[in-house]
């Protein structure tokens, strides 16, 4: 599990991205790069790093499910992910 501070930082960053998304879009459309540079750096969506929504793990993230491979395997074995079955051929 990731440190609580890293998870809190991620939530804060996501809030900033959401807050400034519209303003950032307007400034980009106008081509006002000086105005863009005055916005907080963490308000850019590019700076977000995908993390497991359950335990905050930053590596081995599966975009389709929003979780790490470890949590995915754990929940899939319990049958808690709809539509996921163990492969057999």
From Swiss-Prot:
Task: Read off the PANTHER family from this record.
Answer: 30S RIBOSOMAL PROTEIN S14, SMALL RIBOSOMAL SUBUNIT PROTEIN US14M
Domain of life (superkingdom): Bacteria
Q: What is the annotated role of this protein in its UniProt record?
A: Binds 16S rRNA, required for the assembly of 30S particles and may also be responsible for determining the conformation of the 16S rRNA at the A site.
Pfam families attached here?
A: Ribosomal_S14
Query: To which species is this protein native?
Result: Limosilactobacillus reuteri (strain DSM 20016)
Q: Which family does it belong to?
A: Belongs to the universal ribosomal protein uS14 family.
Q: What is this protein called?
A: Small ribosomal subunit protein uS14A
Could you tell me the Gene Ontology terms of the biological process aspect for this record? translation
Q: Which keywords accompany this UniProt record?
A: Ribonucleoprotein, Ribosomal protein, RNA-binding, rRNA-binding
Molecular-function annotations in GO: rRNA binding; structural constituent of ribosome
Q: Lineage in the entry?
A: Bacteria, Bacillati, Bacillota, Bacilli, Lactobacillales
Keyword rRNA-binding among record annotations: yes
Residue ranges that the Swiss-Prot or TrEMBL entry lists as coiled coil: none
Complex formation: Part of the 30S ribosomal subunit. Contacts proteins S3 and S10.
Q: Which HAMAP family match?
A: Ribosomal_uS14_1
A cellular component term, taken from the record's GO annotations: small ribosomal subunit
